[in-house]
């Protein structure tokens, strides 16, 4: 960033820094990075846009959202119907804004939908569910307490699983 300043380019350069997802070192019995837990699916994303106030924003954003965001910022037309992502310019302009409710993760027969509050995963064999996990990301950041049998969350769990099935069907088209 200092070099962009020195060259006089900082006022016209968008900087995007993203990282790879995490690596389990024995947490939850995993060694590696290929599973549906938050530690293995969450990745850092830092975006610096000239004339945008800096800060930390919440909300759900996926890497597929970067391209449409850059298109909007650079006033480049977005190819209609060809992108899965959605511009997160509204979040850059106001950290309280949201562009989507869920992020979707898929790995080897497992499907996970992640909202700001919950992470819900199912594993399918054919159309049959053979495993489930639900975590409250506010009260259990480390994902240690599977809430799948929680009566108090039954409606939320049902809605999250419905969203997983909808997203899975969309991807199969």
What does each model-found stretch correspond to?
Residues 6-9, 97, 149:
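Secondary-structure boundary motif
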Residues 1-52, 59-62:
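Histidine-centered active-site microenvironments of extracellular/periplasmic hydrolases
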Residues 145-152:
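Active-site-proximal N-terminal segment of extracellular/periplasmic enzymes that hydrolyze or transfer
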